């Protein structure tokens, strides 16, 4: 399809090599660049690559959109700091045997399909309120595939919950054990745990 990228690239320091970053930064749309590679990362194989820029976007740093007001009252209550970092009150919630993807903020970006890579910030808790992971605390983002076999694999509950959401959204995910880690212990996550995530969708590629 015309002007539709075959692939996407996050261009920022730390995600690509310094040489690659300097080569690509500042280029305008419809520019084509050809370059040769023969270094320690090419496994002894030289090759030439050509890139054409057909579109670009600037990723968000936190969820941005309209607050959702019709949230079921029995779900955990989420509040946010000024920088967007979420906190949670479990509100006596006991979990669900089914996946619950509840938008808290409805973004105005593209709709996520089952063939996307999504850039997110997230925090995860157990039902007792114990936080077991947070990209906010690490000042990082995560890339997650909504399909199997990609380079950025996440649990099945994440894959299913993100499809149909929109860029800029913040989503509360209740993930039952069978769509999480099942009977496997995963660090601070006990076997057969229901997982609660709040996920900000910053971009979808």
Label each PLM-derived region with a short phrase.
Residues 1-205:
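Cross-family detector of peptidyl-prolyl cis-trans isomerase
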């Amino acid at each position: 399809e015309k002007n539709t990228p075959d692939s996407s690239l996050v261009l920022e320091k730390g995600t690509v090599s310094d040489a690659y970053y300097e080569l690509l930064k500042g280029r305008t749309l419809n520019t084509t660049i050809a370059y040769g590679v023969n270094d320690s990362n090419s496994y002894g194989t030289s090759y030439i690559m050509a890139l054409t820029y057909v579109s670009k976007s600037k990723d968000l740093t936190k969820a941005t959109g309209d607050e959702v007001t019709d949230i079921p009252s029995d779900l955990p209550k989420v509040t946010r700091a000024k920088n967007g970092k979420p906190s949670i009150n479990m509100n006596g919630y006991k979990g669900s045997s089914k996946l619950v993807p509840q938008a808290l903020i409805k973004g105005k970006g593209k709709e996520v399909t089952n063939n996307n890579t999504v850039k997110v910030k997230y925090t995860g808790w157990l039902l007792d309120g114990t936080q077991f992971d947070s990209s906010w605390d690490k000042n990082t983002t995560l890339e997650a595939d909504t399909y199997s076999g990609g380079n950025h694999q996440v649990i099945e509950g994440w894959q299913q919950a993100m499809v149909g959401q929109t860029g800029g959204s913040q989503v509360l995910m209740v993930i039952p054990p069978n769509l999480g880690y099942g009977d496997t212990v995963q660090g601070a996550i006990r076997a057969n745990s229901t997982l609660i995530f709040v996920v900000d969708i910053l971009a979808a590629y």
